[in-house]
């Protein structure tokens, strides 16, 4: 296939483990990849290293067959053999919620547009904290769309659902945040790439 662009599908602890810096981002930078298909969790965990107050590396190795009860008691979240303080998730949620409240997110959009916009915010946060660019920032810079087949499998979309639920419960104004994920348009977008 000369002239045939690649589509790459990844899952698992790619960003939380830092593998994206080792092999995925270099692959994307070759220019051969038309789009990336992944999970919402991969996109969510991509932001942890750029959060304020963690010095660029809040994630550390833990025994994969260790005592999960003891980790839980200490407030440590485990993803395979990687661990981080539970506060990292809470800070990531605050960061995402702040992004989703910004004006450019207040419309109906595909997940590729959502992740492109988030990539810009991840990139700014990474630059601010001197962190190596992550997956969303790299895809945003290279204009590589990121498709997620199951947006509810991670907390990027769950933060959007939190805002929707708060609006429904009267905790936010009824004319408050209006982000709306257009799943049908994203399916058509994916089909268009395959047809191309």
Where are the regions that the model predicts?
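Conserved catalytic alpha/beta core of Sir2/sirtuin-type deacylases, generalized to analogous enzyme cores
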Residues: 1-10, 16-196
């Amino acid at each position: 296939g000369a002239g045939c662009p690649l589509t790459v599908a990844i899952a698992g602890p790619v960003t939380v483990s830092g593998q994206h810096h080792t092999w995925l981002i270099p692959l994307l930078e070759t220019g051969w990849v038309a789009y990336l298909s992944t999970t919402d969790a991969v996109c969510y965990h991509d932001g942890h290293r750029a959060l304020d107050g963690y010095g660029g590396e809040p994630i550390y190795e833990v025994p994969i067959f260790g005592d999960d009860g003891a980790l839980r008691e200490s407030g440590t979240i485990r993803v395979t053999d990687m661990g981080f303080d539970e506060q990292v998730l809470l800070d990531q949620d605050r960061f995402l919620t702040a992004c989703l409240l910004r004006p450019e997110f207040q419309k109906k959009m595909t997940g590729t547009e959502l992740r492109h916009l988030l990539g810009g915010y991840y990139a700014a946060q990474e630059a601010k904290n001197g962190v190596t660019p992550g997956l969303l920032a790299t895809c945003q810079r290279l204009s590589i769309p990121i498709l997620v087949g199951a947006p509810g499998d991670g907390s990027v979309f769950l933060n959007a659902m939190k805002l929707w639920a708060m609006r429904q419960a009267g905790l936010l104004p009824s004319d408050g945040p209006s982000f709306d994920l257009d799943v049908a348009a994203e399916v058509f977008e994916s089909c268009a790439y395959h047809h191309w």
